[in-house]
Amino acid sequence: MTPPATPLTPTLQLAHDLIRCRSVTPEDDGCQELMIRRLEAIGFKTERLRFGEVDNFWAIRGGDGPILAFAGHTDVVPTGPETHWNNPPFEPTIIDGMLHGRGAADMKGSLASMVVACENFVARHPNHKGRIAFLITSDEEGPSINGTVKVVEWLEARHTKMTWCIVGEPSSTTRVGDVIKNGRRGSLGGVLKVKGIQGHVAYPHLADNPIHTLAPALAELAAEHWDNGNEFFPATSFQVSNINGGTGATNVIPGEVTVVFNFRFSTELTDAILRERTQAILDKHELKYELEWILSGQPFLTPRGDLVNAVVDAINTATGLDAELSTSGGTSDGRFIAPTGAQVVELGPINATIHKVNECISAEDLNKLTAIYERTLEILLA
Protein backbone atom coordinates (compact mmCIF):
# COMPACT_ATOMS: atom_id res chain seq x y z
CA MET A 1 0.00 0.00 0.00
CA THR A 2 1.38 3.41 -0.96
CA PRO A 3 1.97 5.62 2.11
CA PRO A 4 -0.14 8.80 2.20
CA ALA A 5 1.48 11.86 0.68
CA THR A 6 2.97 14.36 3.12
CA PRO A 7 0.73 17.46 3.17
CA LEU A 8 2.47 20.60 1.96
CA THR A 9 2.25 23.04 4.84
CA PRO A 10 3.15 26.69 4.11
CA THR A 11 6.69 25.97 5.34
CA LEU A 12 7.13 22.94 3.11
CA GLN A 13 5.67 24.74 0.10
CA LEU A 14 8.11 27.62 0.50
CA ALA A 15 10.98 25.17 1.03
CA HIS A 16 10.02 23.49 -2.24
CA ASP A 17 9.99 26.83 -4.05
CA LEU A 18 13.42 27.77 -2.68
CA ILE A 19 15.00 24.40 -3.48
CA ARG A 20 13.87 24.72 -7.11
CA CYS A 21 16.18 27.73 -7.45
CA ARG A 22 19.60 26.57 -8.71
CA SER A 23 21.44 28.87 -6.35
CA VAL A 24 24.92 27.36 -6.43
CA THR A 25 27.22 29.82 -4.68
CA PRO A 26 27.39 32.74 -5.29
CA GLU A 27 24.22 32.61 -7.38
CA ASP A 28 20.90 33.36 -5.73
CA ASP A 29 18.70 32.46 -8.73
CA GLY A 30 15.58 34.14 -7.39
CA CYS A 31 15.50 32.80 -3.82
CA GLN A 32 15.75 36.22 -2.25
CA GLU A 33 12.97 37.66 -4.39
CA LEU A 34 10.69 34.86 -3.18
CA MET A 35 11.50 35.76 0.42
CA ILE A 36 11.28 39.51 -0.13
CA ARG A 37 7.80 39.27 -1.65
CA ARG A 38 6.56 37.29 1.33
CA LEU A 39 8.14 39.64 3.86
CA GLU A 40 7.00 42.84 2.17
CA ALA A 41 3.45 41.45 2.17
CA ILE A 42 3.48 41.49 5.99
CA GLY A 43 4.99 44.93 6.41
CA PHE A 44 8.74 44.47 6.15
CA LYS A 45 10.79 47.20 4.54
CA THR A 46 13.54 45.65 2.43
CA GLU A 47 16.83 46.86 1.00
CA ARG A 48 18.51 44.83 -1.74
CA LEU A 49 22.27 45.02 -1.33
CA ARG A 50 24.51 43.76 -4.12
CA PHE A 51 28.23 43.67 -3.45
CA GLY A 52 30.37 42.37 -6.30
CA GLU A 53 28.57 39.35 -7.73
CA VAL A 54 26.71 38.63 -4.49
CA ASP A 55 23.05 39.32 -3.74
CA ASN A 56 22.10 40.22 -0.18
CA PHE A 57 19.13 41.83 1.49
CA TRP A 58 18.17 43.41 4.78
CA ALA A 59 14.51 43.47 5.77
CA ILE A 60 13.06 45.00 8.93
CA ARG A 61 9.63 45.41 10.50
CA GLY A 62 8.59 47.50 13.48
CA GLY A 63 9.15 51.02 14.69
CA ASP A 64 11.83 50.94 17.36
CA GLY A 65 13.20 48.87 20.20
CA PRO A 66 15.39 45.76 20.21
CA ILE A 67 15.97 43.89 16.95
CA LEU A 68 15.56 40.13 16.65
CA ALA A 69 17.26 39.21 13.38
CA PHE A 70 17.14 35.99 11.40
CA ALA A 71 20.33 35.45 9.41
CA GLY A 72 20.91 32.93 6.67
CA HIS A 73 22.10 32.16 3.17
CA THR A 74 20.36 31.26 -0.06
CA ASP A 75 23.44 29.83 -1.79
CA VAL A 76 24.20 26.12 -1.76
CA VAL A 77 27.28 24.03 -2.46
CA PRO A 78 27.64 22.34 -5.87
CA THR A 79 25.77 19.08 -6.30
CA GLY A 80 28.51 17.04 -7.92
CA PRO A 81 27.34 14.76 -10.74
CA GLU A 82 23.55 14.93 -10.68
CA THR A 83 23.43 11.33 -11.89
CA HIS A 84 24.66 10.30 -8.44
CA TRP A 85 21.47 11.62 -6.87
CA ASN A 86 18.40 9.43 -6.47
CA ASN A 87 16.29 12.42 -7.53
CA PRO A 88 17.34 15.60 -9.38
CA PRO A 89 18.82 17.86 -6.69
CA PHE A 90 16.81 20.93 -7.69
CA GLU A 91 13.50 19.09 -7.97
CA PRO A 92 12.29 18.88 -4.36
CA THR A 93 10.76 15.52 -3.57
CA ILE A 94 9.26 14.10 -0.38
CA ILE A 95 9.93 10.37 0.02
CA ASP A 96 8.91 8.52 3.19
CA GLY A 97 8.49 11.82 4.99
CA MET A 98 11.93 13.16 3.98
CA LEU A 99 12.30 16.29 1.85
CA HIS A 100 15.11 15.71 -0.65
CA GLY A 101 17.00 18.40 -2.55
CA ARG A 102 20.16 20.47 -2.47
CA GLY A 103 19.79 22.99 0.33
CA ALA A 104 16.97 21.17 2.11
CA ALA A 105 19.04 21.11 5.30
CA ASP A 106 21.64 23.78 4.51
CA MET A 107 19.74 26.01 4.63
CA LYS A 108 16.64 26.59 2.56
CA GLY A 109 14.54 24.64 5.03
CA SER A 110 15.52 27.07 7.78
CA LEU A 111 14.76 30.06 5.55
CA ALA A 112 11.27 28.75 4.85
CA SER A 113 10.69 28.15 8.57
CA MET A 114 11.87 31.66 9.42
CA VAL A 115 9.57 33.35 6.92
CA VAL A 116 6.48 31.34 7.83
CA ALA A 117 7.16 31.78 11.56
CA CYS A 118 7.20 35.54 11.03
CA GLU A 119 4.01 35.41 8.95
CA ASN A 120 2.24 33.51 11.73
CA PHE A 121 3.60 35.77 14.46
CA VAL A 122 2.70 39.02 12.68
CA ALA A 123 -0.81 37.76 11.97
CA ARG A 124 -1.36 37.39 15.72
CA HIS A 125 0.76 40.34 16.85
CA PRO A 126 0.59 43.05 14.16
CA ASN A 127 1.74 45.65 16.70
CA HIS A 128 4.47 43.57 18.30
CA LYS A 129 7.19 45.04 20.48
CA GLY A 130 10.62 45.79 19.04
CA ARG A 131 11.67 44.93 15.51
CA ILE A 132 12.09 41.78 13.43
CA ALA A 133 14.80 41.68 10.76
CA PHE A 134 16.27 39.38 8.12
CA LEU A 135 19.92 39.44 6.99
CA ILE A 136 20.22 37.15 3.97
CA THR A 137 23.19 36.53 1.65
CA SER A 138 24.19 34.34 -1.30
CA ASP A 139 27.85 34.24 -0.22
CA GLU A 140 28.14 31.89 2.75
CA GLU A 141 29.24 28.71 1.01
CA GLY A 142 31.89 30.61 -0.98
CA PRO A 143 34.61 33.03 0.09
CA SER A 144 32.25 35.01 2.37
CA ILE A 145 33.74 38.32 1.24
CA ASN A 146 30.74 40.14 -0.22
CA GLY A 147 28.04 38.66 1.95
CA THR A 148 27.14 38.97 5.62
CA VAL A 149 30.35 40.80 6.51
CA LYS A 150 29.53 43.57 4.01
CA VAL A 151 25.92 43.83 5.18
CA VAL A 152 27.12 44.16 8.78
CA GLU A 153 29.46 46.98 7.70
CA TRP A 154 26.53 48.64 5.89
CA LEU A 155 24.38 48.36 9.03
CA GLU A 156 27.11 49.78 11.24
CA ALA A 157 27.47 52.77 8.92
CA ARG A 158 23.74 53.38 9.48
CA HIS A 159 24.12 52.89 13.25
CA THR A 160 21.76 49.90 13.15
CA LYS A 161 22.59 47.21 15.69
CA MET A 162 21.00 43.81 16.08
CA THR A 163 20.13 42.88 19.66
CA TRP A 164 19.58 39.17 19.08
CA CYS A 165 20.35 37.06 16.02
CA ILE A 166 19.33 33.52 15.13
CA VAL A 167 21.47 32.01 12.38
CA GLY A 168 19.59 29.19 10.66
CA GLU A 169 22.56 26.86 10.21
CA PRO A 170 21.76 23.16 10.68
CA SER A 171 22.78 22.78 14.32
CA SER A 172 20.78 19.70 15.28
CA THR A 173 22.32 16.23 15.41
CA THR A 174 19.72 13.48 15.89
CA ARG A 175 16.51 15.39 16.70
CA VAL A 176 15.57 18.89 15.62
CA GLY A 177 16.36 21.29 18.45
CA ASP A 178 18.65 18.94 20.38
CA VAL A 179 21.66 21.26 19.96
CA ILE A 180 22.00 25.04 19.92
CA LYS A 181 25.31 26.53 18.85
CA ASN A 182 25.87 29.44 21.21
CA GLY A 183 29.42 30.12 20.09
CA ARG A 184 32.15 29.06 17.70
CA ARG A 185 35.89 28.65 17.86
CA GLY A 186 38.10 31.10 16.01
CA SER A 187 39.80 30.05 12.79
CA LEU A 188 43.34 31.19 11.93
CA GLY A 189 45.04 29.78 8.86
CA GLY A 190 48.62 30.01 7.69
CA VAL A 191 50.54 29.44 4.46
CA LEU A 192 54.18 28.75 5.29
CA LYS A 193 56.88 28.70 2.61
CA VAL A 194 60.29 27.43 3.70
CA LYS A 195 63.24 28.18 1.44
CA GLY A 196 66.13 25.85 0.65
CA ILE A 197 68.56 25.24 -2.19
CA GLN A 198 67.56 22.96 -5.04
CA GLY A 199 70.01 20.26 -6.04
CA HIS A 200 70.63 16.64 -7.00
CA VAL A 201 69.69 13.99 -4.46
CA ALA A 202 73.10 12.36 -4.98
CA TYR A 203 74.86 15.57 -3.89
CA PRO A 204 73.02 16.73 -0.76
CA HIS A 205 76.07 18.69 0.41
CA LEU A 206 75.51 21.03 -2.54
CA ALA A 207 71.85 21.63 -1.67
CA ASP A 208 69.69 22.52 1.31
CA ASN A 209 66.56 20.39 1.60
CA PRO A 210 63.77 22.59 3.05
CA ILE A 211 61.62 19.56 3.85
CA HIS A 212 64.32 18.23 6.15
CA THR A 213 64.88 21.58 7.84
CA LEU A 214 61.13 22.12 8.27
CA ALA A 215 60.37 18.68 9.73
CA PRO A 216 61.57 19.30 13.33
CA ALA A 217 59.74 22.63 13.51
CA LEU A 218 56.56 21.10 12.12
CA ALA A 219 56.78 18.26 14.62
CA GLU A 220 57.11 20.78 17.44
CA LEU A 221 54.12 22.79 16.22
CA ALA A 222 52.03 19.61 16.02
CA ALA A 223 53.06 18.55 19.53
CA GLU A 224 52.67 21.98 21.13
CA HIS A 225 50.11 22.29 23.94
CA TRP A 226 48.44 25.56 23.04
CA ASP A 227 45.91 25.82 25.86
CA ASN A 228 43.52 23.77 27.99
CA GLY A 229 40.30 25.19 26.58
CA ASN A 230 37.60 26.09 29.10
CA GLU A 231 34.09 25.08 30.10
CA PHE A 232 32.72 26.34 26.78
CA PHE A 233 35.49 25.46 24.30
CA PRO A 234 37.80 22.49 23.73
CA ALA A 235 41.55 23.05 23.68
CA THR A 236 42.98 24.89 20.69
CA SER A 237 44.00 22.58 17.85
CA PHE A 238 46.71 22.86 15.19
CA GLN A 239 46.25 20.88 11.99
CA VAL A 240 48.26 20.66 8.76
CA SER A 241 46.02 20.33 5.71
CA ASN A 242 48.52 20.45 2.83
CA ILE A 243 52.26 19.96 2.23
CA ASN A 244 53.69 20.58 -1.21
CA GLY A 245 57.31 20.38 -2.30
CA GLY A 246 59.39 19.00 -5.13
CA THR A 247 59.51 19.27 -8.88
CA GLY A 248 57.89 15.92 -9.57
CA ALA A 249 61.24 14.33 -10.36
CA THR A 250 62.60 11.66 -8.03
CA ASN A 251 66.20 12.85 -8.17
CA VAL A 252 65.79 16.56 -7.34
CA ILE A 253 66.00 18.08 -3.88
CA PRO A 254 63.32 20.81 -3.80
CA GLY A 255 64.21 24.44 -3.35
CA GLU A 256 61.01 25.25 -1.46
CA VAL A 257 58.27 23.54 0.52
CA THR A 258 54.83 24.98 1.26
CA VAL A 259 52.70 23.99 4.24
CA VAL A 260 49.09 25.03 4.79
CA PHE A 261 47.84 24.79 8.37
CA ASN A 262 44.96 25.92 10.54
CA PHE A 263 44.27 26.74 14.17
CA ARG A 264 40.80 26.35 15.67
CA PHE A 265 41.17 28.35 18.84
CA SER A 266 39.25 29.04 22.00
CA THR A 267 38.67 32.25 23.92
CA GLU A 268 41.71 31.36 26.03
CA LEU A 269 43.99 32.69 23.26
CA THR A 270 44.03 35.50 20.74
CA ASP A 271 45.13 35.23 17.14
CA ALA A 272 48.03 37.57 17.98
CA ILE A 273 49.31 35.14 20.63
CA LEU A 274 49.08 32.22 18.20
CA ARG A 275 51.03 34.14 15.57
CA GLU A 276 53.74 35.07 18.06
CA ARG A 277 54.14 31.54 19.43
CA THR A 278 54.18 30.00 15.96
CA GLN A 279 56.82 32.40 14.68
CA ALA A 280 58.91 31.87 17.82
CA ILE A 281 59.05 28.13 17.11
CA LEU A 282 59.94 28.70 13.45
CA ASP A 283 62.64 31.20 14.40
CA LYS A 284 64.10 28.82 16.99
CA HIS A 285 64.74 26.33 14.19
CA GLU A 286 66.45 29.04 12.10
CA LEU A 287 64.25 28.50 9.07
CA LYS A 288 64.29 30.77 6.06
CA TYR A 289 60.59 31.27 5.60
CA GLU A 290 57.68 33.42 4.50
CA LEU A 291 54.40 33.18 6.39
CA GLU A 292 51.01 34.49 5.32
CA TRP A 293 48.19 34.53 7.87
CA ILE A 294 44.46 34.27 7.13
CA LEU A 295 42.10 35.10 10.00
CA SER A 296 38.68 33.70 9.08
CA GLY A 297 36.96 34.53 12.34
CA GLN A 298 37.42 35.27 16.02
CA PRO A 299 35.91 32.97 18.63
CA PHE A 300 32.63 34.12 20.09
CA LEU A 301 30.33 32.99 22.87
CA THR A 302 26.78 33.95 23.76
CA PRO A 303 26.25 32.97 27.41
CA ARG A 304 22.86 32.32 28.91
CA GLY A 305 20.72 35.43 28.67
CA ASP A 306 17.62 36.68 26.89
CA LEU A 307 18.26 34.93 23.56
CA VAL A 308 19.65 31.61 24.75
CA ASN A 309 16.94 31.30 27.39
CA ALA A 310 14.21 32.14 24.88
CA VAL A 311 15.43 29.58 22.35
CA VAL A 312 15.86 26.87 25.01
CA ASP A 313 12.31 27.58 26.22
CA ALA A 314 10.94 27.58 22.66
CA ILE A 315 12.55 24.23 21.84
CA ASN A 316 11.19 22.66 25.01
CA THR A 317 7.68 23.96 24.28
CA ALA A 318 7.70 22.79 20.65
CA THR A 319 9.52 19.46 21.01
CA GLY A 320 9.83 18.57 24.69
CA LEU A 321 13.62 18.50 24.37
CA ASP A 322 16.15 20.09 26.70
CA ALA A 323 18.60 21.55 24.20
CA GLU A 324 22.35 21.18 24.62
CA LEU A 325 24.50 24.29 24.24
CA SER A 326 27.57 23.65 22.08
CA THR A 327 30.45 25.51 20.42
CA SER A 328 31.67 22.58 18.31
CA GLY A 329 31.97 22.52 14.53
CA GLY A 330 33.27 24.92 11.93
CA THR A 331 32.74 28.61 11.35
CA SER A 332 29.51 30.31 10.29
CA ASP A 333 28.43 33.83 9.44
CA GLY A 334 27.72 34.29 13.13
CA ARG A 335 31.40 35.22 13.39
CA PHE A 336 30.67 38.46 11.52
CA ILE A 337 27.62 39.35 13.61
CA ALA A 338 28.84 38.59 17.14
CA PRO A 339 31.53 41.33 17.16
CA THR A 340 28.76 43.96 16.82
CA GLY A 341 27.62 43.09 20.33
CA ALA A 342 24.59 41.05 19.30
CA GLN A 343 23.67 37.88 21.14
CA VAL A 344 24.03 35.15 18.50
CA VAL A 345 22.92 31.53 18.36
CA GLU A 346 22.68 29.01 15.55
CA LEU A 347 19.56 26.91 15.40
CA GLY A 348 18.44 24.80 12.49
CA PRO A 349 17.61 21.29 11.32
CA ILE A 350 19.58 18.05 11.53
CA ASN A 351 22.97 18.30 9.81
CA ALA A 352 23.54 14.62 8.94
CA THR A 353 23.29 15.07 5.14
CA ILE A 354 24.55 18.60 4.56
CA HIS A 355 26.84 18.99 1.52
CA LYS A 356 26.20 15.33 0.63
CA VAL A 357 24.62 13.63 -2.34
CA ASN A 358 20.90 13.06 -1.60
CA GLU A 359 20.75 15.84 0.99
CA CYS A 360 17.46 15.54 2.86
CA ILE A 361 15.57 16.55 5.97
CA SER A 362 12.46 15.36 7.76
CA ALA A 363 9.47 17.29 6.46
CA GLU A 364 7.93 17.27 9.92
CA ASP A 365 11.15 18.70 11.38
CA LEU A 366 10.68 21.83 9.27
CA ASN A 367 7.22 22.29 10.73
CA LYS A 368 8.70 21.89 14.22
CA LEU A 369 11.44 24.38 13.39
CA THR A 370 8.78 26.89 12.33
CA ALA A 371 7.09 26.42 15.70
CA ILE A 372 10.41 26.93 17.52
CA TYR A 373 11.17 30.16 15.68
CA GLU A 374 7.59 31.36 16.21
CA ARG A 375 7.71 30.64 19.93
CA THR A 376 11.03 32.51 20.19
CA LEU A 377 9.38 35.54 18.60
CA GLU A 378 6.53 35.25 21.11
CA ILE A 379 8.90 35.18 24.09
CA LEU A 380 11.04 38.11 22.98
CA LEU A 381 8.65 40.41 21.11
CA ALA A 382 4.99 39.60 21.87
Swiss-Prot record:
Binding site for Zn(2+) 2: 106, 141, 355
Top-tier EC class: hydrolase
Residues annotated as transmembrane: none
Binding positions for Zn(2+) 1 per the UniProt entry: 73, 106, 169
Cofactor, free-text remark: Binds 2 Zn(2+) or Co(2+) ions per subunit.
Associated pathway: Amino-acid biosynthesis; L-lysine biosynthesis via DAP pathway; LL-2,6-diaminopimelate from (S)-tetrahydrodipicolinate (succinylase route): step 3/3
Reaction(s) catalysed (UniProt annotation): N-succinyl-(2S,6S)-2,6-diaminopimelate + H2O = (2S,6S)-2,6-diaminopimelate + succinate
Leader sequence residues: none
Keyword annotations from UniProtKB, A to Z: Amino-acid biosynthesis, Cobalt, Diaminopimelate biosynthesis, Hydrolase, Lysine biosynthesis, Metal-binding, Zinc
Active site positions: 75, 140 (proton acceptor)
EC number: 3.5.1.18
Role this protein plays: Catalyzes the hydrolysis of N-succinyl-L,L-diaminopimelic acid (SDAP), forming succinate and LL-2,6-diaminopimelate (DAP), an intermediate involved in the bacterial biosynthesis of lysine and meso-diaminopimelic acid, an essential component of bacterial cell walls.
The protein's name in its UniProt record: Succinyl-diaminopimelate desuccinylase
